[in-house]
Amino acid sequence: MSMRAPQLDWLRPGQGSGLRFVTAIGIVAVFLQVTLIPRFDIGPFAATPNLVVATVVAVAAFRGVVVGAIFGFTAGLLVELLSPGDTLGVLAIAYVAIGAWCGRFASGSEPIGRVTAVLLVVAAAALVPIWLGTVGLLRGEGPPVGYLLGHLVIPQIVLAPLMALPAWWAARRLLGAPREVEPWLVPT
């Protein structure tokens, strides 16, 4: 029994809502982040490039605020569940804010180019350690501000462009042109 072309439309990248590919991109990004991406130790700086932040920015830019926020929450929660950490949900909240913010930024009249995407990833990657440090300070166990900025934020800013373009390319290839997707609305 052979399948006709219309039955295979959901397998083609860029067709439909792309939510299957959003799920696949998220699972691959979280898996790579938790297992394969190396930790760089350069002098006093030690950091791991954040592929999940770059993927959240790319998905939010191509699918809008709602999908970006939901994707950010689930990716952040998966990273927290799969890697050792202390407080569950802190990273997920940061990724929700990043997904919603980047989705809102991308919903303008002009499509986002590669340079703007890299700048968004750099800004988002810098916000994650600031957020984690702020939550740590509120709990009374965070790092000093100088250490936070000098040893946590700057390495993320330097390493973020390494992850930005591969994540952007994968999202563009699999999701197609940017468009708003509301997952719970049924087309009429």
What residue spans do the PLM features occupy?
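Terminal, non-globular segments
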Residues: 1-188
